[in-house]
């Protein structure tokens, strides 16, 4: 399933705030991204069609709720990166992310633990996935 950058922004708001009315989403997204009402309605319709959101009529508004969980979205994002980035470049991508992002000491210790466990199944050479 492909989710556009704009659709990710909509999902992030619903994950953070919980279910939202179309009116509330339009207000937030118009203000934050300067998107038109029709653009937002199109994004919402696409997310419903992709089964990322549910839509229920309530009075004059629709209520949108997330069907796609943040955990499932993380899996989609990881797969998307694996599909788009040469497998020989993943190490550098991870290093760049670590350099560019803020982490607590506990976060970094957790990353060290993941790396330690991964060493047990390390390969001698990473094969290119580009061809």
Explain the meaning of each model-derived region.
Residues 27-35:
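Short helix-coil junctions and helix-kink-helix linkers
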Residues 3-6, 58-77:
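Short, cationic-aromatic polyanion-contact patches
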Residues 75-76, 99-131:
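C-terminal regulatory/oligomerization modules of transcriptional regulators
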Residues 69-95:
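Conserved segment of winged-helix/HTH DNA-binding domains
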Residues 51:
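Glycine-centered, phosphate/nucleic-acid-interacting loop/turn motifs that mediate DNA/RNA or nucleotide
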Residues 5-13, 24:
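Pre-recognition alpha-helix immediately N-terminal to the DNA-recognition helix
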Residues 44-45:
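Short, hydrophobic-biased segments on the C-terminal half of alpha helices
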Residues 20-28:
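Short acidic, hydrophobic short linear motifs in intrinsically disordered regions
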């Amino acid at each position: 399933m492909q989710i556009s950058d704009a659709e990710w922004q909509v999902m992030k708001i619903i994950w953070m705030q919980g279910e939202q009315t179309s009116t509330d989403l339009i207000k937030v997204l118009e203000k934050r991204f300067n998107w038109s009402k029709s653009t937002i309605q199109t994004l919402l319709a696409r997310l419903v069609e992709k089964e990322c959101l549910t839509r229920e009529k309530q009075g004059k508004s629709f209520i949108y709720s997330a069907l796609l969980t943040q955990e499932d979205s993380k899996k989609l994002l990881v797969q998307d990166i694996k599909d788009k980035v040469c497998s020989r470049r993943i190490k550098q991508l991870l290093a760049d992310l670590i350099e560019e992002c803020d982490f607590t000491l506990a976060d970094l210790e957790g990353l060290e633990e993941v790396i330690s466990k991964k060493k047990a199944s390390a390969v001698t050479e990473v094969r290119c996935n580009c061809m």
